[in-house]
Amino acid sequence: MFNTSTVRAAMKANTPTLVNPCEKTRQAAVASILREPRTAAAGQTEMLFIQRAERPGDPWSGQMAFPGGHREASDVSLQAAAMRETYEEIGLSLANADYLGALNHQQAQPRGRVLNMLIA
């Protein structure tokens, strides 16, 4: 069954493979946001997705995605970048959320930049 306890246990057992980006690499991070039902009868654990804006020339235009974006110089970590971007994009503060961990760093395609995935 998919719930935050299952995800928490999997993340605790996971040691993510990290990529050490070069100085010119632009990093990005996303937040995978889970919400447990308030009661057992209320349903199942939910995961939040957004629909990306439609823009000509954007290969991911209009697709479903996790909230997130590029890391700025003011972001102290990739987690901070994911939190800031989530608030900017959908107005949801993750300041009081339980941080469960990071997934393996992934190379974004086709641009070849490092995309670091976070779960919050």
Question: What are the residue ranges of the model-derived segments?
Answer:
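N-terminal leader/linker segments that precede catalytic domains of diphosphate-processing enzymes
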Residues: 1-66, 70-120
